């Protein structure tokens, strides 16, 4: 495991020009237009851990994947919203994280492929997450929300609305 001090992350990203497409408004618009023309695949990597199973179904217009443990009984659920700054699709590291959570905790992990900018809105993503949490509660019992970057914002927004609706999560 490589541990990088936080103070080095920003300079390292600038050095490798990781976010060069998003440095200017014009660059961001070009990248979004290119991704609309040539979408990035969002399916799971060809190989994940051997101790999980991946399934997919439709939830309205969204593909929704579930990653379930195969070596132990599934207990509980996690609804995980991937990061990507609202413009980036789910990446291999998100799949690895979901598989690790499923295998090591026994939870069934739900991964929605929510619509990205310019095709979706934060409100649509939040509403979809709320419905997926309700479904996970019915199917898997106690359910937690998780997410990173844009997905963290989606998860937090959904959690606040669920709280306001009287839904108690672990």
Residue ranges and their predicted role:
Residues 75-84:
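Short beta-strand element of the alpha/beta-hydrolase
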Residues 88-99:
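The serine-hydrolase catalytic nucleophile loop
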Residues 41, 107, 141:
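Short glycine/serine/threonine/alanine-rich loop segments
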Residues 84-85, 108, 131:
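Glycine- and small hydrophobic-enriched segments that form the cores of compact globular domains
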Residues 64, 79, 101, 122-170:
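Short strand-loop-helix active-site module centered on a catalytic nucleophile
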Residues 98-119:
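Conserved alpha/beta-hydrolase
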Residues 1-69:
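A glycine/proline-hinged amphipathic helix-loop "lid/cap" segment
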Residues 86-88, 118-120:
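Short, small-residue-enriched loops and turns at beta-alpha junctions
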């Amino acid at each position: 495991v490589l541990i990088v001090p936080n103070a080095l992350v920003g300079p390292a990203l600038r050095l490798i020009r990781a976010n060069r497409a998003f440095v200017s408004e014009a660059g961001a618009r070009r990248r979004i237009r290119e991704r609309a023309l040539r979408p990035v695949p969002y399916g799971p990597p060809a190989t994940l851990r051997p101790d999980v199973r991946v399934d997919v179904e439709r939830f309205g217009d969204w593909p929704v994947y579930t990653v379930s443990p195969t070596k132990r009984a599934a207990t509980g659920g996690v609804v995980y919203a991937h990061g990507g700054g609202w413009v980036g699709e789910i990446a291999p590291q998100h799949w690895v994280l979901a598989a690790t959570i499923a295998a090591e905790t026994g939870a069934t992990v739900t991964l929605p492929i929510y619509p990205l900018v310019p095709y979706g809105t934060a409100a649509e993503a939040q509403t979809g997450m709320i419905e997926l949490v309700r479904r996970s509660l019915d199917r898997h019992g106690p359910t937690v929300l998780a997410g990173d970057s844009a997905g963290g914002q989606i998860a937090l927004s959904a959690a606040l609305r669920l709280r306001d609706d009287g839904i108690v999560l672990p």
